[in-house]
Amino acid sequence: MPRAVLYVDLDGTVARSPMPRVIRRAYEVLASLSGLSVQQVEGVAWAIHLELASRSLPQAFDWDYIFERVASELGVRAEFSVEREFSTVCPESVALDNSPEVLRELGRSGYTLILATNGLMKYQRCVIETLGLDRYFSYIYTPDNRGCLKNCREFYAPPEGVDSGLPAVSVGDNYTFDVYFPKLFGLLTVHVVRSTREDPYLALVRRPGAGLGRLGGLDLLPEADASVRNFGESAVAVGRLLEDFHRRFRS
């Protein structure tokens, strides 16, 4: 029996892809056609993206869908495919922090590894195959096969045949999707801290009706169960968390 289920993020955690560059190019195309600045186009796209993400819809991370939505709002037409453009540069994707070796170590430690990403499979498949990451994971969870994003409880339902009573751990670099929501759903969390800047996706938990508590004018944001500086430190962090978990369970 596995010791625990680990939901491991992809982008920014175990790998970095050129997708941001492709999205930026898409916005430049729309800016050129509309006469707006790239920053203005980004603002329109972000509003659409955030609204979809607030409803946990997979289209929030369908960059071709968002491109078409923005083009429609701006009253322009453009022939641009994010998926096609990304496929030409995807081989530039790189593994971070010797992540294949870390994943191999986690697998040997008896954990069931699930690659858990908000990216759609039509974009992520190339990254996964380029870096050979599929060999380390028993399952791959994406919004298009889960029906929602990582801010919905159903995303984390264990696979068929995996004991739902096993401890579950989220490992990732995005505070909102890899720490805040997983903790809300009862998972342990390991935050791979890549930046000290505030996560812009906190806008999702600060929306009216989102239920975020406040005290003395400050948001009551839960801390990760463990924070690490890079993915390479996550194996030790996960081991310690689970030792503490089982110690509390026995007592």
What is the meaning of each model-derived region?
Residues 1-2, 100, 104, 114, ...:
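Asp-based, Mg2+/Mn2+-dependent phosphohydrolase catalytic module
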Residues 1-44:
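Active-site neighborhood of HAD-like aspartate-dependent phosphohydrolases
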Residues 19-21, 52-59, 197-210:
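Short, flexible/disordered intra-domain loops and linkers
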Residues 22-30, 45, 49, 67, ...:
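Hydrophobic alpha-helical core bundles mediating ligand binding, dimerization, or RNAP-core interactions
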Residues 31-46, 74-84, 135-137:
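Short, surface-exposed acidic
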Residues 46-84:
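A metal-dependent, Asp-based hydrolase signature
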Residues 61-64, 84-114:
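Short, acidic loop-to-helix structural element flanking the phosphoryl-transfer center
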